[in-house]
Amino acid sequence: MTFKGFSKKDFQTMQIPGLEARMAGIQNDIQPKFKAVGEELTTYLSAKLGDEMFLHIARHQRRSVNPPESTWLAICHDKRGYKKHPHFQVGLFDNYLFIWLAFIYENEESAKIANRFLKEKKLLAELPDTFAISPDHTEEKTFPVHDGHLETTLERFRDVKKGEFLVGKIYLPDDSHLSPGKDFIKEAEMVLDKLIPLYKAALQ
């Protein structure tokens, strides 16, 4: 499909009641966009990193009762899975779109990565004020990257077994960067460029 951008309808899909109905909306309306966006960004990251990257689209197969509050694509160097590795995400809650560099609770090197970021503060200090962080990919709550929550979020990521750290940028449903498609791709590439130094540091 030709990607024309994300619309308010995509956010409304994440409000559809019921597991079956919401999953139908995600599969029919959002995942084709994820495939189109993800293929472009996977190619972009592969070239930028000099390493083959692979696209994964969340299937939410473990859900049997409650519909997913968010849905996403992930881009990772591992073809078999992304959750235990540093990876990039583009996804939606019902009230914002996110572009993250994500370290979720399955990551096996959380302490090492958190300590590196805590020690090398310049890596995160150079991020734009428009960027945000999240301590939990399942929750909508985010914080501006420079508002004082960064250190405690990294410490929680290091010290708590299911701690997480996500950093990137969020967009409200009426943000002009979400469409047309070429504008969103350009914006996403800009965000990824800012996150690549962190990604490389996490892999060291």
From Swiss-Prot:
Superkingdom: Bacteria
InterPro entries in the record: UPF0637, UPF0637_domain_sf
One protein family per Pfam: DUF1054
Family: Belongs to the UPF0637 family.
Name of the molecule in the record: UPF0637 protein lwe1043
Lineage start: Bacteria, Bacillati, Bacillota, Bacilli, Bacillales
